[in-house]
Amino acid sequence: MLENRKRDIRKQAYALREKCKVSRYGIIDLFRECERLGYKLLRYPLGEDADLGFVMKKDNDIVVFTNTCSRLAREIFTLAHEIGHIVLHLEKASSFIDNTITIVGRSMDEKEQEANYFASCLLMPDDEVDKFLDLEIADFADKGLTAMDIARIMSEFNVSFEMALNRLENLDKISGYERIKLDNERNQLRVGNLLRSVGGNQRLNEATGEIEIPYEYIEYVIDNYNHNAIPQETLEKALECYHLTIEDIRDKLVEREEAEDEDLDALLGGITD
């Protein structure tokens, strides 16, 4: 990636970050910020082997999806990656679908690399990283970083251990050798134990399995049911996401014949068509 392009991406990432609510160093809740920015956010547990996320244009909306079977830290990075596609690429494309290859950074596709760089700048801006190392790691210049320090960075910036290492190495805060050493420490001590030892956010290392669907999509669900596209069981599952029952929307339903079974995963798939 050319330096001029990287500079442009940094500017756009930092400009968007200024609209977000931040703690001492990190964005407090990127999911809420996504909604505040006007995007329609869907969070659903598609499975550990499924795609991590996607972004698409649907009518006048921009729909962002994240798979809540991912560890929370990875789901947050996936969301930041999808926001990168929105800011950088969505004017010239209708959708992007991302998996482990594109999110982890092994893809050679230029747009995927740019979205990853945007996400890194959004979540861990270089000036905030410098400030953290200066103010929070007293002996950084002399002794470098430990795995416990990385766990603290995870909690402050709401990122994964791997993402913290990637960003620190890219900013020349650690060498390739130091990265391997920290990786080995991580493997020996385990991220969950490291987070506990520093009083960090242990949820970052766990999948939430949460279901969040924009409320207006209930109309889409009802319409599918009324046109025999989904069975009552699927309708009821969808209503549970909104804490509703059949009786709450009875006046919007039409009499219909029983349709073939189809689950909520298929319904969400229909939203992406």
Q: Each predicted region: which residue ranges?
A:
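Active-site hotspot residues in diverse enzymes, especially metal/ion-binding acidic/histidine motifs
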Residues: 1-273
